[in-house]
């Protein structure tokens, strides 16, 4: 088994020539390699809808974790229910932070997402994902190279130093148009905020619509020197 510790033995390669640009092959390999020791960390963005559909074909009982920060858009919570109905056999886990919003405010002040967004992300996303990955050998992410400068070198299989794990990214070669084409072709549910200028949807407090010509991460933590929550630093 390929693990963080045995990374030097990595000789895995995949063809990008099929209709999913290698995504199904990558997922098939991942679930064969890690069996029940892999989880998909899903934010329920539009890429997530594609991956959930593909994962359901490969492993209908796969584990899916959603990092419920308690400050997501209502539309996101409604979408999760639709996904549960569409893919009832998937094991969707809504992971909560240890601190409630009130407890966080008492310790760090109100509106931590404004005063210290990095700490807020650590408490409400990074630490919960660390806990979710503690007993896993690998995790799946919907990163695409086209999304931003910070993601353009992502590979199918990555040694993830942040979580000391293997990060599997099946959609790296997909374009934004291809993602939507797949969603429409398979009549997949998606967050209606995508239709009103939100290409990337995170917490309600830190996500704004993106103007024409911006990249998909421009609406995240707008006005701050920050485009990632910290989950995807290598």
Curated annotation (Swiss-Prot):
Its cofactor is [4Fe-4S] cluster. It catalyses: [thioredoxin]-disulfide + sulfite + AMP + 2 H(+) = adenosine 5'-phosphosulfate + [thioredoxin]-dithiol. One of its GO terms (molecular function) is adenylyl-sulfate reductase (thioredoxin) activity. One of its GO terms (cellular component) is cytoplasm. Pathway: Sulfur metabolism; hydrogen sulfide biosynthesis; sulfite from sulfate. One of its GO terms (biological process) is sulfate assimilation, phosphoadenylyl sulfate reduction by phosphoadenylyl-sulfate reductase (thioredoxin). Its EC number is 1.8.4.10. Gene3D superfamilies: HUPs. Binds 1 [4Fe-4S] cluster per subunit. It is found in: Cytoplasm. The active site is at 229 (nucleophile). Coiled coil: none annotated. CDD domains: PAPS_reductase. HAMAP family: CysH (MF_00063). Belongs to the PAPS reductase family. CysH subfamily. Catalyzes the formation of sulfite from adenosine 5'-phosphosulfate (APS) using thioredoxin as an electron donor. This is Adenosine 5'-phosphosulfate reductase. It comes from Bacillus cereus (strain 03BB102).
């Amino acid at each position: 088994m390929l693990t963080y510790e045995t990374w030097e033995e990595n000789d895995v390669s995949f063809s990008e020539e099929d209709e999913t640009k290698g995504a199904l092959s990558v997922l098939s390999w991942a679930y064969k390699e890690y069996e029940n020791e892999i989880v998909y960390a899903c934010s329920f963005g539009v890429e997530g809808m594609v991956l959930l559909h593909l994962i359901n074909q490969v492993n209908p009982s796969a584990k899916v974790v959603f990092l419920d920060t308690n400050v997501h858009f209502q539309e996101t919570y409604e979408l999760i229910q639709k996904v549960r109905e569409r893919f009832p056999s998937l094991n969707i886990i809504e992971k909560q932070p240890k601190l409630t919003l009130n407890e966080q405010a008492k310790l760090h002040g109100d509106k931590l997402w404004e005063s210290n967004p990095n700490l807020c992300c650590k408490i409400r996303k990074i630490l919960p994902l660390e806990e979710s990955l503690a007993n896993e050998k690998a995790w799946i992410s919907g990163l695409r190279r086209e999304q931003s400068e910070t993601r353009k070198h992502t590979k199918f299989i990555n040694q993830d130093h942040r979580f000391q794990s293997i990060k599997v990214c099946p959609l790296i070669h997909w374009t934004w148009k291809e993602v939507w084409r797949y969603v429409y072709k398979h009549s997949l549910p998606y967050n209606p905020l995508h239709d009103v200028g939100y290409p990337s949807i995170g917490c309600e407090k830190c996500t704004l619509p993106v103007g024409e010509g911006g990249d998909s991460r421009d609406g995240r933590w707008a006005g701050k020197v920050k485009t990632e929550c910290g989950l995807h630093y290598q």
